[in-house]
């Protein structure tokens, strides 16, 4: 499950119209979400809140023999109040990554939003995608104290700058300076292709990542006005070099994904990937399929041409909807509205009601609208299963219990025919709306 700060960062990317699927780092994101899902390592409690449309806080406390915690702060120049921030209202699919439908590439454009209620004031508007900025810092409290900071800025509608800093405090009796590292990343996304340039102060590492989408250019007005794509084929590569340690790394990959569109010949959406690391001789293929809106499967096969070692992993996710009778609108007065409706319309039969047809029509439309929203935002839970070639099984259940988001992880690792290791881990998340 994503942390609250990660969810806010995804909301920032969505608010600024940044396509995170158009990146080589997201080439195998669908298979990784279904097969390499993260699990809680200990009993951990998260308390988070979007205090203002521009400011968010998060506190974490964990304990299993050793008490630790962290404090996080986030500031965004783009208002994020349009995104739900309470744990009872955030769609669980936003927090628990699963099968991810690859978005079709679009040409980045600059958009304007209203930042206050004065429509006639020119200063009431700001430009999204040009000067949008995000600051994020997390301080891990127990020794050794570690500070993680992130600076994100949209230089232009097609370029984004990211600076990540990690600093660790040294031993108490040591007088040496804290260990720190900086990772700078410049992304250039045109829709047709995406280039990322990286530099890390660790061993002076330089890197490049690129992704190319086959097909029409989304920047072309003629291509953008044509029929939507039914599939997408992308090719990418990455390369790294460190002059200090003489480290060289490279990889390349392909991705084919079908769109979830209404076509005369409808098929299940699926994603195929092929990645190759020439220096190490590693070859990996993945196949992910969404059999229904609530069921998805994925498999991965890896092979090394040098050592002849192989790996095979399979997994699936199953979503379960738990419908609630009433949905809280978040303003605390839904009970009053329900009482008024029951007093005005005590009889369900239309012939026994004294209301006019227009009133009945308006009420029915309002009820259908609320019912549709309730189905989209109703309480959900998901069960993820992963098994490898050694029959090591991992189960993860994520769901809601009242206002809490709960994760329960079950791990069974087989060491021999007679011995196995079983672990049960738990994490609780609670988001406030102050």
Curated annotation (Swiss-Prot):
Q: Where in the cell is it found?
A: Mitochondrion outer membrane
Q: Which Pfam families match?
A: MDM10
Tree of life domain: Eukaryota
- Record GO biological process: establishment of mitochondrion localization; mitochondrial genome maintenance; mitochondrial outer membrane translocase complex assembly; mitochondrion-endoplasmic reticulum membrane tethering; phospholipid transport; protein insertion into mitochondrial outer membrane
Supply the InterPro entries for this chain: Mdm10
Q: Please state the protein's primary subcellular location.
A: mitochondrion
Q: Which key words tag this protein in UniProt?
A: Membrane, Mitochondrion, Mitochondrion outer membrane, Transmembrane, Transmembrane beta strand
Any single Gene Ontology cellular-component annotation: SAM complex
Tell me the membrane topology, using the record's own terms. Multi-pass membrane protein
HAMAP family according to UniProt: Mdm10
The entry sums up its family as follows: Belongs to the MDM10 family.
- What's said on domains? Lacks alpha-helical transmembrane segments, suggesting that it resides in the membrane via beta-sheet conformations similar to those predicted for other outer membrane proteins and porin.
- How does this chain assemble? Component of the ER-mitochondria encounter structure (ERMES) or MDM complex, composed of mmm1, mdm10, mdm12 and mdm34. Associates with the mitochondrial outer membrane sorting assembly machinery SAM(core) complex.
PANTHER family listed in its UniProt record: MITOCHONDRIAL DISTRIBUTION AND MORPHOLOGY PROTEIN 10
Name the job this protein performs: Component of the ERMES/MDM complex, which serves as a molecular tether to connect the endoplasmic reticulum and mitochondria. Components of this complex are involved in the control of mitochondrial shape and protein biogenesis and may function in phospholipid exchange. mdm10 is involved in the late assembly steps of the general translocase of the mitochondrial outer membrane (TOM complex). Functions in the tom40-specific route of the assembly of outer membrane beta-barrel proteins, including the association of tom40 with the receptor tom22 and small TOM proteins.
Report what the protein is called. Answer: Mitochondrial distribution and morphology protein 10
Q: Which organism is it from?
A: Aspergillus niger (strain ATCC MYA-4892 / CBS 513.88 / FGSC A1513)
Q: What is the lineage of its organism?
A: Eukaryota, Fungi, Dikarya, Ascomycota, Pezizomycotina
